[in-house]
């Protein structure tokens, strides 16, 4: 018979008790399960993971802008495979349509809305969603020009405007009328024109600026078609265009030059959870709220964040290389009338 030291027996029993305690806690509380990864437990007891204290299954719908939709769909598929009682579905929603589609009077509202940027949430106003939320990715505007165009290596709002003014044949592609990208474009143009990163409604409504911008926009042959598509035609339909940085990987890079505006607007994609589920019971509403928070945590994890680069996007909180434009609520309202 082996004469095991008493201290070893004590430590072994303590280890067993701690292991059992962590296992039981992980089966009961989601917060513990996050840090107590146990593949065997998940295999043997998958149904014991309860998204709420009531153990109610939750299916949530996440509305994402087209720029982010493919990434969110991939993340949702991975999340669904790892969770037994939570299922995440994804739909597409442009910020320009959010005010109409997310109105409190509309039935079957998505449980989460990922807006393009914080200013989009401000522009929509009274919808039943949080006023702010964690950023899950990042994007921004970028100028792209045909390598042989007149703008050469100097690519900016001013150089494009000067080229359009000096050559009647110079053509530019800009974001569609009434789009969120158009609002961001107006803010970027105004900031560069005034050399001012902190925009006000007065700066956006300045007559001299608006006249200068209208002259530039007169060189845009098609303001309803995506600028990426106009640049991607063979040959390109325009000499220069303003796109999102995530569109850059879809172009033949060797044929173009690329430069973010000196004053850029960040698309930070805030994750906004519904503030009420008036059509559901309290338990069902709580289950959806917790499921939405779980998916938010998942999107901010290393796996999904590491895949953003595959979609031409940057990680949440990436450090910008240029000045970032900021604007208050009156400036946001002025932006809505700017890009028409």
Where are the model-predicted features located?
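Surface-exposed patches in mature extracellular/periplasmic domains of secreted proteins
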Residues: 86-93, 131-132, 200-204, 307-317
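Periplasmic-binding protein-like
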Residues: 133-142, 207-216, 252-284, 288-290
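Extracellular/periplasmic juxtamembrane helices and adjacent flexible linkers that interface
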Residues: 5-41, 53-56, 276-340
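Ligand-binding pocket segment of bilobal, Venus flytrap-like solute-binding proteins
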Residues: 191-260
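Short beta-strand->loop
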Residues: 63-65, 146, 164-205, 213-217
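Short helix-loop capping/hinge motifs at secondary-structure junctions, enriched
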Residues: 148-155, 191-199, 277-292
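N-terminal segment of the mature folded domain
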Residues: 7-28, 33-178
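Stable alpha-helical elements in mature extracytoplasmic
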Residues: 68-75, 94, 98, 113-123, ...
